[in-house]
A protein has these predicted regions:
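Helix-turn-helix DNA-binding segment
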Residues: 296
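Structured, helix-rich domain cores that form ligand/interaction pockets
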Residues: 1-288, 309-352
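Residues in the recognition helix of alpha-helical DNA-binding motifs
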Residues: 299, 306
Length: 352
């Protein structure tokens, strides 16, 4: 499903008047206007959800926010095509009177015209995985915080946990809240997130929905400007539902659980210097405090390649002889669109 989008639309026909939420004016020391910047205008859509729009000039329109949530009041399920999502949001903006003229008057006749005129600077592809029990989601998140890492991303591939007040999720590829110009992978418990950012009142207390959400692990792949440019994905015409699914799957496949697969044959072939560094890590020591900086990163790279173990992540302590360790397999499956989705959408429509 598509979540957050930032897009700039080059309008085939100009706007008759500016579209903004006011102006920021900067004066120099003599009181002369030095610069004027149009501010984003917040437009409230379905069930108090909002998009931000701004026209830097009469020939351009910027749209930022969650188009699926703006149109239907939630982002629990929805379209996986960013062009479809953006067009639906544009139609809603027109219906709300947020645009000075109809879309047709701007030369935007449908999704195909929009795809030819727009350019993306951020696209979030997301999906939810469903566990059998709510506490399985918390167990997976704890494991990701301790042992998760993004392959071949260096320090930015390490986990950055969220505060519990924000839902207790974890971000890979940059710190939480940091604008990602490349890619980020974000995990959080959807059941907790809807307590921080409540659902519309008409569905917020639905027991069937809340039980389902409590078992959902949200997995968001955030694609920034540099990545979209590198992959030729700034043009909406390059996007389909299949493309969004490919981007999500590719990023998820880069996720490793540090040291989850032991490879004794690879360990036997390590040079002595790498065995020493790996042995220090196994013993619970911090190799970064033992070796010079450049040496540590050389060792880290080579051990990561040979063993799929990142010695920059502290090793989990082994249980003592008095403790019998238990491991269990947690199965997560695609949540998809639940059986009761039509009922929830009908409630939202009747209370919209």
């Amino acid at each position: 499903m598509i979540d957050f989008i930032s897009a700039r639309i080059k309008l085939p026909r100009p706007l008759p008047v500016p579209v903004n939420g006011g102006l920021f004016v900067r004066f120099d020391e003599h009181g002369e206007v030095e610069r004027t910047t149009a501010l984003r205008k917040r437009v409230v859509g379905s069930h108090e959800t909002a998009l931000q729009i701004r026209a830097p000039g009469v020939h351009e329109l910027e749209v930022t926010g969650n188009p699926v949530k703006f149109v239907q009041g939630h982002n629990l399920w929805g379209t996986s095509c960013p062009v479809t999502a953006l067009w639906a949001a544009m139609v809603r903006l027109e219906a709300l009177g947020a645009l000075p003229v109809p879309l047709r008057a701007l030369g935007l006749l449908g999704p195909s015209t929009l795809a030819e005129s727009a350019e993306f600077s951020r696209v979030d592809c997301t999906a939810m995985l469903l566990a059998d029990r709510w506490f399985d989601v918390e167990t997976v998140l704890r494991s990701l915080r301790v042992a998760g890492r993004l392959r071949d991303r260096g320090a930015s591939g390490l986990p950055y946990p969220w505060p519990e007040s924000q839902g207790g999720g974890v971000t890979f590829g940059g710190r939480p809240g940091q604008s990602a110009r490349h890619r980020q992978l974000v995990f959080y418990a959807k059941g907790k997130e809807v307590k921080v950012h409540p659902l519309p009142e008409c569905i917020g207390d639905d027991p069937q929905l809340n039980e389902w959400l409590a078992r959902c692990l949200r997995c968001e792949v955030r694609l920034g400007t540099n990545y979209l440019r590198k992959r030729g994905l700034r043009a909406p015409a390059m996007w389909t539902e299949e493309r969004a699914g490919m981007e999500w799957t590719e990023m998820m496949e880069r996720m490793d659980m540090n040291g989850s697969e032991e490879r004794p044959e690879a360990l036997a072939g390590l040079p002595p210097r790498l065995k020493a560094a790996y042995g220090a890590w196994l013993a619970g020591m911090d190799p970064q405090s033992i070796f010079p900086r450049s040496t540590f990163y050389d060792y880290r790279r080579d051990i990561l390649k040979a063993l799929a173990v990142d010695i920059a992540i502290p090793r989990q302590s082994e249980p003592s002889a008095e403790i019998v360790p238990f491991r269990r397999v947690i199965e997560l499956r695609p949540a998809g669109r639940p059986d009761f989705a039509d009922r929830i959408d009908a409630l939202l429509a009747s209370n919209g």
